[in-house]
Amino acid sequence: MTQWIAGEWVEGLGEEFTSLSPYDNQVVWRGKGATAEQVEMAVKAARQAFVGWKKLSVAEREAMVLAFAEQVKENSEEIAQVIAKETGKPLWETRTEAAAMAGKIAISIRAYHERTGESQKEAAGNQIVLRHRPLGVMAVFGPYNFPGHLPNGHIVPALLAGNTVVFKPSEQTPWTGELAMKLWQAAGLPQGVINLVQGGKETGIALAESKGIDGLLFTGSANTGHLLHRQFAGQPGKMLALEMGGNNPMVITDHYGDLDATVYTIIQSAFISAGQRCTCARRLYIPLGEKGDALITRLVEATKKLRVDQPFAEPAPFMGPQISEAAANFILAAQANLQSLGGESLIEAKAGEAAFVTPGIIDVTNIAELPDEEYFGPLLQVVRYQTLEQAVELANDTRFGLSAGLVSTDDGEWQYFVDHIRAGIVNRNRQLTGASGDAPFGGPGASGNLRPSAYYAADYCAYPMASMEGEETLLPATLSPGVEL
């Protein structure tokens, strides 16, 4: 039983698909996808549930969400184990994701009260009231890199605001999506408030095309996000929130401070989660000269020693495999293409068993037309530069704008960087992959439109209703010109 529709677990009627553990290619989940007809059943179930769900008080909806939070906490180790088996991420990392699932719920609740809710004031004898109302049925598309944590940042704010949800996990991580829905079920969520549809591309197309949804919340690749944007063209009545990827630059200056601390910050930025975070550093700008040379030498030495292994290995690895062999082959093909364009590998990424790829670093300084692509994996491009102004200009030469970072102890360099860089997340002397759940998450350009973090998700899960109110109608002492009573 792979689909959860109207509170019932039912078998999919579409094509069979499987989830393979990327570190050994073992099948960890098997089922059939939802057909277009089943997707419509899920949307209709969500529409029917919306009538009662939106009428509940905020306190009642919040209590249901908190019950889910307790389920997450009680089952955190199972969540971590499932995510590790399905994504290949090290167990230490998936345990942090399980904890973040619960932590993001508290942020979402606070955000609802601070950014939405109801407020009123008096002006010129009128009560000016601001209320917020749910949009209706929200489709949520989840990614594979954080299959528990990131969908939660959409689903919880949507439910708190009074919406109902149809959730489609990534076809790479159906097991995690199924487990999350079973925890909602255990929390006592009324039937139809969340509906789960599993499947691949065809299931996703059917959900996005459904006339019964009022909005779509998406985290995933830029290519899929752009397809959704075109699909929603001419439908201003539907809300579309896109959080996509980035070709993220990290600039190091001669004033980088401690050498090992800088190397560690780069490694955390480029290779954590095997490079499968949308905020990972893809382009590393290092100054020409002795200090830059020393940094590269140390970075190469440290990267060669990174432990790459299956998630349950002892001692624990720093990173695991790519999500699939296809994803691994994409990284190797990208490396080969950059080499053919004139790039020089400082460390060559190499294929291992199943979906494993070792970290790669390639100097692309001599490539005249550097491809503006997101290489979603452990492949770091190095560019040598002469001036900070040149580095920032090169860093901004991308259609993306998700994250960027500067490593420098010089306040003047930081001020120049933060004034001229184009990105939604800009860090100083911290890893690019570090982001706060109560800060906006997203960026301009091809990286998306809205800010789908837990805190700012409240902004697009409800619409504001402005009212001017009085207890009775009023007749002014002086009527408007041309009016006689």
From Swiss-Prot:
Keyword set for this entry?
Arginine metabolism, NAD, Oxidoreductase
Q: Name one Pfam family in it.
A: Aldedh
Q: Does the keyword NAD apply?
A: yes
- List the CDD domains hit by this protein, alphabetically: ALDH_SGSD_AstD
Organism's domain of life?
Bacteria
Q: Where on this chain does NAD(+) bind?
A: G220, S221, A222, N223, T224, G225
Catalytic site positions: E243, C278
Gene Ontology BP annotations: arginine catabolic process to glutamate; arginine catabolic process to succinate
Q: Which reaction does it catalyse?
A: N-succinyl-L-glutamate 5-semialdehyde + NAD(+) + H2O = N-succinyl-L-glutamate + NADH + 2 H(+)
Annotated EC? 1.2.1.71
Alphabetized GO MF terms? succinylglutamate-semialdehyde dehydrogenase activity
Named in its record, the pathway it takes part in is: Amino-acid degradation; L-arginine degradation via AST pathway; L-glutamate and succinate from L-arginine: step 4/5
NCBIfam families referenced in this protein's UniProt entry, alphabetically: arg_catab_astD (TIGR03240), PRK09457.1 (NF006992)
State the family named in the UniProt similarity comment for this chain.
Answer: Belongs to the aldehyde dehydrogenase family. AstD subfamily.
Q: Which PANTHER family match?
A: ALDEHYDE DEHYDROGENASE-RELATED (PTHR11699)
| Biological role stated in the UniProt entry | Catalyzes the NAD-dependent reduction of succinylglutamate semialdehyde into succinylglutamate.
Q: Which HAMAP family match?
A: Aldedh_AstD
Name-wise, this protein is: N-succinylglutamate 5-semialdehyde dehydrogenase
- Protein species of origin: Vibrio vulnificus (strain YJ016)
Taxonomic lineage of the native organism:
Bacteria, Pseudomonadati, Pseudomonadota, Gammaproteobacteria, Vibrionales
